[in-house]
């Protein structure tokens, strides 16, 4: 459980996540493989727009197949991390539009939110350059973050939502919503 996979087989794979694989991830992986001959193993040459959804999912390494069944890990310098502040919230009409909107936005800067959660997720004034969020503890059933933000903001977590999650800030339970 310490190694995360963004697209492998899992008996409990959620339908929405499978839709994300079909709509974005497969195409981004194909684009990556087509680009590799021109950049070698240096993904910093391609910028962060080639694989925005994979970056949003914090894909730190790509396992590139070689001959005779071998693979080589390739570092992704554009992975967004476990959590990050965004500058903008874009509201859409439904969950399908959340997935579609990811074709037009850069998840590093924009969170896409279903309008039915607009009262819970207020658009913030934008990320403060001094704000930080760091994953300090990772267990299968508990993630802990340390946040420092002088003016607050909207944070996106690179996690796949499962029913029953609970969130706490300074020991107090808080409401939160899943996002695209």
What are these regions (language model features)?
Residues 58-64:
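Short, hydrophobic beta-strand segments that form beta-sheet elements in well-ordered domains
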Residues 60, 69, 103, 108-180:
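Active-site-proximal, structured, solvent-exposed surfaces of multi-pass membrane proteins
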């Amino acid at each position: 459980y310490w190694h995360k996979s963004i697209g492998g087989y899992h008996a409990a794979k959620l339908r929405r996540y499978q839709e994300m694989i079909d709509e974005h991830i497969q195409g981004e992986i194909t684009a990556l493989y087509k680009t590799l001959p021109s950049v070698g193993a240096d993904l910093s040459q391609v910028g962060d727009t080639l694989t925005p959804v994979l970056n949003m999912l914090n894909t730190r390494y790509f396992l590139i197949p070689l001959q005779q069944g071998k693979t080589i890990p390739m570092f992704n310098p554009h992975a967004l991390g476990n959590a990050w502040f965004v500058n903008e919230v874009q509201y859409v009409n439904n969950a399908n539009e959340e997935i579609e909107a990811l074709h037009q936005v850069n998840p590093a800067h924009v969170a896409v939110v279903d309008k039915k959660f607009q009262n819970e997720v207020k658009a913030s004034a934008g990320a403060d350059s001094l704000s930080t969020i760091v994953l300090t503890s990772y267990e299968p059933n508990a993630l802990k973050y340390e946040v420092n933000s002088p003016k607050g903001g909207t944070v996106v977590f690179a996690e796949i939502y499962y029913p029953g999650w609970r969130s706490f800030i300074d020991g107090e339970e808080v409401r939160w919503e899943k996002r695209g």
